[in-house]
Structure formats: structure tokens, C-alpha cells
């Protein structure tokens, strides 16, 4: 597991906005940024209580945080999210677009509603989050988008919708990095493999050879850990630590990249 050594407060004075930060990977990212001294805007869509719990956890690290409700699939809500963040903290230095959803369906069964739900959150929302970040970030800021190992993975059935929604984000990343360069803003994407979250609990069996619904979680973890040289499945803290590096001034020469976060897993 990730170690618990004391973390230097290398992001003191920075302000970060993390979408979907009330749980899962987003929570892990928000906490790691806060441990390093950043003030954090914890965005959530519907579950206020978990988001406020993240704010409370951040306060225990000595950093500041605020929870702001916004449905990021709606552009006016994205605009309001950024305006409220700026009113609360005065400026923004780091924006992490994390929210996402996953659907596994045979191609012939995918409906327009399925398509719109996945692409509205995984793809369209990330475009407009990045657009607003570009406008509002101070010079030298950081944008981190969320792709997935699925964007370049073959051999997984019923996966076209999710894989396609994440592949588009990788194209955004490379183009945005060019467009944002004059403000010295870097734009990167991370592409995690399996990470222990509620989405993992619901869908990870699809990635296990001969996996089936209702598999015990211990079997799923063991099956996926077998692909990883480190012998385990990722936890949100693992992802948060990489994002914390990308948010740091030392990461400036990492730009326009998609960073695969799988612990070396080969599938």
C-alpha cells in the first residue's frame, strides 16, 4: 500500500479545484493536494454529506477547503462553479477534471441515452472544464484531465462507449497543451487502471479473465493484482500522489502527456 510518511507542504499558497471530489479518485486527489498545503474546492453533483466530510478531512491537514455543488455536464453550472471558487479563494492555480461514469453494453444495445450520459460527463464536461480552467487559471497553472487505461486497451468486450469517451480526452490534452502554452499552463491527462472505488466495485469483474457478476471482491482484487508487478490493486491515494506531482512547479516540463497509472500492469 501507499506509505504514510509526512508530506512536505510544497503547494502552500496554491488553490486547486477538483471535480467529483466527494468520493473515490477525486477524494484521493483532493486530500493529497491538501496535504501539500493547497486550498481545495471540492466539487460534487448530488451527495453533499460525503463532500463536506472531505472538506472536514482537509481541515485536519491544516489546509482550507470548500464544497461547491455543480452539475458539470451543464456549461452554465461549470461557469458558476468557477465563479464561486474564485469568489471564495480569490484565484485558481490547479484544476483537476475527475468526474466520470462507465457503461458496459453490447454495441447493438447502446441507446442514445447511454451515449449521451457517458459522453456528456466523460468527454463534453472535461472539454468545458478545461476551457474554463484556461480562462481563469493564473499564469503557470496546471490542468489535469482524466483518461483511462481503457482508452488504449483491446480485448475487453462491450467497452466501446467508455473507451471512446476517454480516447477523446487524450486528444483534447495534446491540443490544449499547445493552446495554453502562452500562459505557461501545462495540460496533462492521467490514465489509471483499476482503482479501488465504488465504480471499481461495480465494474471491475469485467476486466478479470472469466469474470462474472457477483464475483467476491477478494477474487476480483486477486485476479487483477496478478497482472501487476507490485502485486496489488491501486487505491485513490496512488492517483492523488501523481496528480500532486503534476501540480507542483517541478513538473513544468511534463506537458501534453497522457500518463498511464497501472503499477506496471500488463493485461
UniProtKB/Swiss-Prot annotation:
Which keywords label this protein? NADP, Oxidoreductase
Has the keyword Secreted been applied to this entry? no
What positions does the entry give for NADP(+) binding? 25, 45, 71, 98, 162, 166, 195, 197
Pfam families per UniProt: adh_short_C2
> So where's the catalytic machinery, residue-wise?
147-148, 162, 166
Matching entries from PANTHER family are given as: OXIDOREDUCTASE, SHORT-CHAIN DEHYDROGENASE/REDUCTASE FAMILY (AFU_ORTHOLOGUE AFUA_5G02870), SHORT-CHAIN DEHYDROGENASE_REDUCTASE FAMILY PROTEIN
Family to which the UniProt record says this protein belongs: Belongs to the short-chain dehydrogenases/reductases (SDR) family.
Entry protein name: Hydroxynaphthalene reductase-like protein Arp2
Q: Which gene encodes it?
A: Arp2
Amino acid at each position: 500500500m501507499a506509505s504514510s510518511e509526512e508530506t512536505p507542504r510544497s503547494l502552500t499558497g496554491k488553490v486547486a479545484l477538483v471535480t467529483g471530489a466527494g468520493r473515490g479518485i477525486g477524494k484521493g486527489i483532493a486530500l493529497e493536494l491538501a496535504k501539500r498545503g493547497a486550498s481545495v474546492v471540492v466539487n460534487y453533483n448530488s451527495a453533499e454529506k460525503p463532500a463536506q466530510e472531505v472538506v472536514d478531512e482537509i481541515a485536519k491537514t491544516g489546509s482550507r477547503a470548500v464544497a461547491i455543488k455543480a452539475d458539470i455536464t451543464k456549461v452554465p453550472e461549470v461557469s458558476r462553479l468557477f465563479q464561486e471558487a474564485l469568489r471564495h479563494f480569490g484565484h485558481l492555480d490547479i484544476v483537476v477534471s475527475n468526474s466520470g461514469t462507465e457503461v458496459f453494453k453490447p454495441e447493438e444495445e447502446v441507446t442514445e441515452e447511454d451515449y449521451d450520459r457517458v459522453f456528456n460527463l466523460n468527454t463534453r464536461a472535461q472539454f468545458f472544464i478545461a476551457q474554463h480552467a484556461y480562462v481563469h487559471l493564473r499564469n503557470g497553472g496546471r490542468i489535469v484531465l482524466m483518461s483511462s487505461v481503457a482508452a488504449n486497451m483491446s480485448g475487453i468486450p462491450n467497452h466501446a462507449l467508455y473507451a471512446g469517451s476517454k480516447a477523446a480526452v487524450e486528444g483534447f490534452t495534446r491540443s490544449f497543451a499547445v493552446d495554453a502554452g502562452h500562459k505557461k499552463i501545462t495540460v496533462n491527462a492521467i490514465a489509471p487502471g483499476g482503482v479501488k472505488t465504488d465504480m471499481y466495485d461495480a465494474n471491475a469483474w469485467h476486466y478479470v479473465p472469466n469474470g462474472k457478476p457477483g464475483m467476491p471482491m477478494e477474487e476480483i482484487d486477486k485476479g487483477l493484482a496478478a497482472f501487476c508487478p507490485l502485486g496489488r490493486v491501486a487505491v485513490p491515494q496512488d492517483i492523488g500522489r501523481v496528480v500532486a506531482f503534476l501540480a507542483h512547479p517541478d513538473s513544468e516540463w511534463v506537458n501534453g502527456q497522457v500518463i498511464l497509472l497501472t503499477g506496471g500492469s500488463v493485461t
